[in-house]
């Protein structure tokens, strides 16, 4: 339990690398990068796993990454959305339960869940299982009007908002997520992309 959010709180932010939507490759992989930071200022470490584009392995990859790492003083997991590598959907409750860490999901735009459900039904045999994961996520909370939203599992909304503020250095996205995005894109394309 987090009583007070300190400026040096240890957080882990995950983001994925690029991949090709038009690829005919089955089981195409992309990188999942986790950046461990003290607040928004000091990078403590980087974790990586490979995940399957449109697969079902992102939750396992995150759990394995956290539980097998040397970083035992993590306090919060930050995610940039709940879908990675296309429609590889994170099971937020399972991630929280199996790591023992609260999870805070940060997004810049409200996702169109109905459009996501339609796309899943059109392209996936296991669409209903993926849709069930989307539907069981907590409601979005607006932090910055029309610019930043979050949802949280295992942490109250006030504390989650404070974690986001403490870990954000510039702009709206927490620094661990911004750096994870840059590292993941550099691994996959040879050069980092802007957040």
From Swiss-Prot:
InterPro entries: Endo_dU. Pfam families: DUF99 (PF01949). It comes from the Archaea. PANTHER family: UPF0215 PROTEIN MJ1150. Belongs to the UPF0215 family. This is UPF0215 protein TK2033. It comes from Thermococcus kodakarensis (strain ATCC BAA-918 / JCM 12380 / KOD1).
């Amino acid at each position: 339990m987090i009583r007070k959010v300190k400026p040096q709180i240890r957080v882990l932010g995950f983001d994925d690398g690029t991949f090709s939507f038009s690829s005919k490759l089955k089981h195409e992989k992309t990188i999942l990068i986790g950046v461990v930071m003290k607040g928004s200022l000091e990078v403590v470490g980087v974790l990586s796993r490979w995940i399957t584009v449109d697969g079902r392995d992102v939750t396992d990859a995150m759990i394995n990454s956290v539980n097998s790492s040397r970083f035992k003083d993590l306090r919060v997991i930050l995610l940039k959305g709940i879908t990675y590598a296309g429609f590889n959907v994170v099971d937020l409750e399972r991630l929280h339960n199996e790591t023992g860490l609260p999870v805070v999901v940060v997004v810049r735009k409200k996702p169109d869940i109905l459009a996501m459900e339609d796309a899943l039904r059109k392209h996936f045999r296991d669409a209903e299982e993926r849709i069930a994961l989307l539907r069981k996520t907590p409601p979005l909370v607006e932090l910055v009007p029309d610019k930043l939203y979050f949802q949280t599992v295992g942490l109250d909304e006030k504390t989650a908002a404070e974690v986001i503020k403490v870990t954000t250095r510039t702009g709206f996205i927490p620094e661990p997520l911004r750096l994870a995005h840059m590292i993941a894109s550099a691994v996959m394309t040879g050069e980092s992309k802007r957040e």
